[in-house]
C-alpha cells in the first residue's frame, strides 16, 4: 500500500509539473515605461537600457505574482500570441507587477510608444530551454 501511495504521488506531481510547463495562459496585457522612478532596474536586478528597448533588442515583460505560482521564473522566455503583431514573439520575464494584479502581463515599451494604447488579452506559453 505504501508503494502504491508513493507511485501515485509521483504521478500526480509529474502531471502538475507537465501542466504548468506546457500550459497556455490568457492574460490581460498592458504596457509600461520604466522611467526614473524605478531607477532603471527590473525586479530581477537587470538594468534597463532605453535604447535597446526602443530598438527591440530587449523585449522584457513583467508578470503578475500569481504567474510565479504557475511555474514562471525570472529569466524565462515566453512566447506571446495576440492580435497585435508588435506583441507577438518571444519576450523575457524580467519584472514583476503589483501584488494586486492577477492574470496580467506588462510589456516594457519605450517612452511615447503607440504599439498599443488600450489593454488587450494575449496568450502566453513558456518556452522550454533546449
For the regions a language model picked out, list residue spans one by one.
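Bacterial N-terminal signal peptides that target proteins for export
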Residues: 1-8
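Hydrophobic helical h-region of N-terminal Sec-dependent signal peptides
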Residues: 9-17
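Solvent-exposed, well-ordered loop and adjacent helix/strand elements within mature globular domains
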Residues: 22-130
Amino acid at each position: 500500500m505504501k508503494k502504491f501511495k508513493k507511485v501515485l504521488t509521483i504521478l500526480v506531481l509529474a502531471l502538475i509539473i507537465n501542466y504548468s510547463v506546457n500550459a497556455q495562459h490568457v492574460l490581460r496585457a498592458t504596457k509600461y515605461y520604466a522611467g526614473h522612478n524605478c531607477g532603471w532596474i527590473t525586479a530581477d536586478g537587470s538594468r534597463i537600457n532605453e535604447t535597446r528597448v526602443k530598438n527591440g533588442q530587449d523585449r522584457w515583460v513583467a508578470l503578475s505574482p500569481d504567474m510565479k505560482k504557475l511555474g514562471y521564473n525570472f529569466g524565462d522566455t515566453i512566447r506571446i500570441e495576440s492580435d497585435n503583431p508588435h506583441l507577438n514573439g518571444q519576450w523575457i520575464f524580467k519584472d514583476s507587477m503589483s501584488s494586486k494584479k492577477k492574470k496580467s502581463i506588462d510589456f516594457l515599451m519605450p517612452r511615447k510608444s503607440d504599439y498599443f494604447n488600450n489593454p488587450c488579452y494575449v496568450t502566453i506559453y513558456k518556452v522550454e530551454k533546449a
